[in-house]
Amino acid sequence: METARRDSIDFFLGATTPAGFKGYFEPLRHEPGMQMYLIKSGPGCGKSTLMKRLARAAEQRGELTQRIHCASDPDSLDGVILPGQHRAIVDATAPHVVEPDAPGADEVVVSLYHTIDAEKLHQCTDEVKALFARNALLRSRAARYIACLLYTSPS
């Protein structure tokens, strides 16, 4: 995880629990006057890179910046909040899917799907599907391990 600056706050808004992944973006969405930008795209399409650049630019302007780190990859960002502007930009894809309640009014969907090289991915369809299935299996396994740690008392 990058070193925090004085003008930034770093935290998580989600975690793997015994019941699977739990995200806590709802309170942020319902903060009065908050404008949400919901980024939609596949893995590796630049969502976190975009948010890191936005956070860095805001910090260079002297703005307080809140970075929401990814629970499964703390070097990645799931969101950036700019409290002074009442704006937030979040990764709105699985496992923390966020859909707009008031598109255009409170939330703006930012699609980065055009950055996907669909032709190249299509050539590897079986491998891509296998990797997504493996990811789901490992997330489920992690949830079971956490449940064992929490609910199994030492003998």
State where each predicted segment sits.
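N-terminal pre-Walker A segment at the start of P-loop NTPase domains
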Residues: 2-24
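Phosphate-binding P-loop
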Residues: 28-33
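Hydrophobic anchor at the beta1->P-loop junction of P-loop NTPases
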Residues: 39
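The conserved Walker
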Residues: 43
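Conserved glycine(s) of the Walker
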Residues: 46
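Hydrophobic positions on the alpha1 helix immediately C-terminal to the Walker A/P-loop
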Residues: 50
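Conserved nucleotide-sensing/catalytic segment adjacent to the nucleotide-binding pocket
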Residues: 61-114
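Conserved small/polar residues in nucleotide/adenosyl-binding loops
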Residues: 151-155
